[in-house]
Each structure stands twice: as structure tokens, then as C-alpha cells.
Amino acid sequence: MLSDSIVSGTASLELDYGDLTVKQTEIGNLCKVKNNAGDVRLTDVSCGSSEMELDYGSLKLQKFTETDQAQSSAFTIFDGDVHCETSTLWNSSFDLEFGDFSTIDTALYGKNTIAMDYGDVQLNLHGKNSDYNVGYSYAAGSLNDSSRNQILISGDKTVVDATVTFTE
């Protein structure tokens, strides 16, 4: 567990197995997490951007804030769920093989992609419908530039269900 810390540059956290919890931590630049088997929970954490890779395990972000509006973030989960609650993410790419993706009162700002092989997407986005352009692509596709905040959800429509709601 990492708690009540300040990291001035990049935080690189790598585990072969086991759960990782990070609480009340400020990371100046990149938050890089890799875990082969185990859950990762980040609560009340801020960073510039993120790179997270989990083979077997779930990712929970609560009060997680990315501050770099220009940098892209990548989240790759092979077998596990992703849950974001009251978080702010910028230009994020989520790639899930097996598992569900959900948010509660979370802002996905900039250009975002959610690619699912098997699982459900349940987005409760911070803001209102007019703040976002949410698109669904069950084949190759892209979003237009009609909104600053774009979310492209892609996957096989026979095995991926998606719902989107908003919280102001």
C-alpha cells in the first residue's frame, strides 16, 4: 500500500501478483501501474496521465484525477472489470478483453475510446448530454469533431451492451 505520499515525477508500480492500493497520493507526471494477477485500487490520487496494465484483476479508481489535458492515457485490462467513481480522466483509451466497464459521476474529457471484447459498458458521466459526443462503433468507425469531449465505444454488439446517463 502507498498512502499519503507525493511523487514529483513518474510513479512506476509493478507487481507480479497481489493487490495494490494507493490512497491520498499526488503524482507529478505519469502514474504507471502493471499487475499480472491482482486488483488495483487508487483512491484520492492525482497525476498528470496514466498507463495501467492488468492481466488478471480489476481496476477501481475513486476520486482519481488526471491533470494533463494534452497527454493521452492508456488502460489495458485482459480479464477484469474497470470501475471509476467521481473521477476526472483526459484522452483515455480503455481496452478490455473480458470484463465490465462502469463509471459513476466521472468526467471523461477530450477524446476517449472504450474497446470491449466481452462485457458491458455503463457510463454515468459528470455533466450533461450536451457536454459529450458519445458514439457506438460495432465495426471500424470514428467520431466527428462536434464536441470537445468524445467517447467512442466499440465491440461486438452481440456480446457488448452499453448505457449512458449523466449527472450534473
Regions found by a protein language model. Give the residues of each.
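Intrinsically disordered, low-complexity terminal regions
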Residues: 1-168
